[in-house]
């Protein structure tokens, strides 16, 4: 191993949302002189406006820093910033695979949260060296000793020499950097071996094409190298290689252990698959690097342009977004009510919201979304098994033997005062109690098995409001279980509106149908004829509301006069309304589609 490689340290920062990960990254950048005072702004690495507004990290970023340590040597530090939210675990697992070590940041006031745990386990699976860092020690409510104890008890890491830091005040930054140099091992790999780079992210540039962020594991890549993608076998010629300091800067070559980017005039987005291995076309490596686990979407929903003509734009936007967001999956679908659109798969509700907002902002689209739903497993009477990701594709009742739905194992960390509220919520959501564990005197970890369908609606919002924001949630899929599920349809003026169809538990169907009919009655404008709204299961109507017709006062001109004259006019009006009802169509406003989403609130 050359001296240059021995002085490289690749690390990432793992933390729960709001524990100060991005601020710590800012301080590290500032301390190593990567940014001047003028360029310094809060959350430098959160470059998307959305990330700033919500105060969360969505995309991972990679930065190369030079640090002169106390031993007089200059080290190259590659910091890979990762998201902390449960929906973005995939982004986290990608960045962990590119590192040798991780800083585990824990808030000195809040202690360990559920997602901190999930990410730590990911790091341990990847054999990373973990350095505990206790942040926000300048807060009046900080209890660093209690938090150190928690790290030891819950995770089993030795936290006796955990670094005490206040990223905001800039305390303990140098100690953190020294610990990175001392504890994290340098990357292994041979610069002369056949090339193997792992793509851990990519983005699209209008001038240069698709740009891949890579971690070089073996070999060297430079301008002019002919490269080959191992999953597709396509070859390209490298036009530039470089590193981020945070701004992109060209370098002569990237060798084993380094992190940077490769530009190779790749026109097609699909050719730079995240998790793929790049090798030298002339001297290829024998086999690809152990890739990422293929990501499985948990939540599906339909995305439709408000104007039918926006379909092509939506497709292009999704193609471009897919490049930076490896977890997004979509396929075209049509709906009677909404026209042409896409069925999209997401990792969770936050991911769905973020994708929708990015489409609306970055690509200037107006979208309608349908209610989110999970994938159901239908066992048919003829022995076939079908997977249904859209309620309208559910086979007819007489063909269904049983329907299974995905269950998750949810771990909720909560202060002991709120245990009752959380248990009540889980019970309402058809949860099965598994275990309850006191981590510290005031903190409890509850483990429940819940149907995923109950979590994707508003479980997280409710959890936060019932625990005053103190609870944190992490969940993992544990498989399918048989449930009493039915398909609830909405008929409007006798026509089935497919976008409103949902699959619900039989016990909930009546209340759900009732609430939906009430909500739609308020949202759909009155027509010239009366419009019945019916909630049906199969052929059975379980709830009905009627939107009254707007009517003109046809008797206004009759002063006094015979009753039969008035009756004739009223009958004539009634006849007209009846004819209208047969041919009339009802315009459904955008809010009505959104109502399906917020029905539980």
Swiss-Prot record:
Major location category of this protein: membrane
Signal peptide: none
Entries under SMART domains matching the protein: EFG_C
Protein localization: Cell membrane
GO-annotated cellular components: plasma membrane
Domain tr-type G intervals: 6-188
Family named by the database record: Belongs to the TRAFAC class translation factor GTPase superfamily. Classic translation factor GTPase family. LepA subfamily.
UniProt-listed NCBIfam families: lepA, small_GTP
Biological function: Required for accurate and efficient protein synthesis under certain stress conditions. May act as a fidelity factor of the translation reaction, by catalyzing a one-codon backward translocation of tRNAs on improperly translocated ribosomes. Back-translocation proceeds from a post-translocation (POST) complex to a pre-translocation (PRE) complex, thus giving elongation factor G a second chance to translocate the tRNAs correctly. Binds to ribosomes in a GTP-dependent manner.
Listed name of the protein: Elongation factor 4
């Amino acid at each position: 191993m050359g001296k240059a490689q021995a002085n490289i340290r690749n690390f990432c920062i793992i933390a729960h949302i709001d524990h100060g990960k991005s601020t710590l990254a800012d301080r590290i950048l500032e301390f190593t002189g990567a940014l001047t005072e003028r360029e310094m702004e809060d959350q430098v690495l959160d470059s998307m406006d959305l990330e700033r507004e919500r105060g969360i990290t969505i995309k991972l970023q990679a930065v190369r820093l030079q640090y002169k340590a106390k031993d007089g040597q200059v080290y190259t530090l590659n910091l890979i910033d990762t998201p902390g939210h449960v929906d973005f675990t995939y982004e986290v697992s990608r960045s962990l695979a590119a590192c040798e070590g991780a800083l585990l940041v824990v808030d000195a006031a809040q202690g360990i949260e559920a997602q901190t745990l999930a990410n730590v386990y990911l790091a341990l699976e990847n054999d990373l060296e973990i350095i505990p860092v206790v942040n926000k020690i300048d807060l009046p409510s900080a209890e660093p000793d209690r938090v150190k104890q928690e790290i030891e008890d819950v995770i089993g890491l030795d936290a006796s020499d955990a670094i005490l830091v206040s990223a905001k005040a800039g305390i303990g930054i140098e100690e953190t950097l020294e610990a990175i140099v001392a504890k994290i091992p340098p990357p292994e790999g041979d610069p002369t071996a056949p090339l193997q780079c792992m793509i851990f992210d990519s983005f699209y540039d209008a001038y240069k094409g698709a740009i891949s962020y890579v971690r070089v594991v073996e070999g060297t890549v430079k301008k002019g190298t002919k490269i080959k993608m191992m999953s597709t076998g396509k070859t390209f010629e490298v036009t530039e290689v470089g590193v981020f300091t945070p701004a992109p800067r060209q370098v002569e070559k990237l060798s084993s252990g380094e992190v940077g980017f490769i530009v190779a005039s790749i026109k097609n987005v699909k050719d730079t698959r995240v998790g793929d291995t790049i090798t030298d076309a002339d001297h290829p490596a024998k086999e690809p690097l152990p890739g990422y686990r293929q990501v499985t979407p948990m939540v599906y929903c339909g995305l439709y342009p408000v104007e039918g003509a926006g379909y092509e734009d939506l497709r292009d936007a999704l193609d471009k977004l897919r490049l930076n967001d490896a977890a997004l999956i979509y396929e075209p679908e049509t709906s009677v009510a909404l026209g042409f659109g896409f069925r999209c798969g997401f990792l969770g509700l936050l991911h769905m919201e973020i994708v929708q907002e990015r489409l609306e902002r970055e690509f200037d689209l107006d979208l309608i979304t349908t209610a989110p739903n999970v994938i159901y497993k239908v066992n048919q009477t003829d022995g076939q098994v079908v997977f249904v990701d859209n309620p309208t594709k559910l086979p007819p009742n007489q063909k269904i033997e049983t329907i299974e739905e995905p269950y998750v194992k949810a771990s909720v960390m909560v202060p002991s005062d709120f245990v009752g509220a959380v248990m009540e919520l889980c019970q309402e959501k058809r949860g099965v109690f598994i275990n309850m564990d006191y981590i510290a005197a005031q903190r409890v970890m509850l483990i429940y098995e819940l149907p995923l369908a109950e979590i994707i609606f508003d479980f997280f919002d409710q959890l936060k409001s019932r625990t005053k924001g103190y609870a944190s949630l992490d969940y993992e899929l544990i498989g399918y279980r048989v449930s009493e599920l039915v398909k609830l349809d909405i008929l409007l003026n006798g026509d089935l509106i497919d976008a409103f169809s949902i699959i619900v538990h039989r016990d909930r169907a009546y209340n759900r149908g009732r609430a939906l009919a009430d909500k739609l009655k308020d949202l759909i404008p009155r027509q010239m004829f009366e419009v019945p709204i019916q909630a049906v299961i199969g052929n059975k109507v379980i709830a009905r509301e009627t939107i009254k017709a707007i009517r003109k006062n046809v008797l206004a001109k009759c002063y006094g006069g015979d009753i039969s004259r008035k009756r004739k006019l009223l009958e004539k009006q009634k006849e007209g309304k009846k004819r209208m009802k047969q041919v009339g169509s009802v315009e459904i406003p955008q809010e009505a589609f959104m109502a399906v989403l917020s029905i539980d609130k």
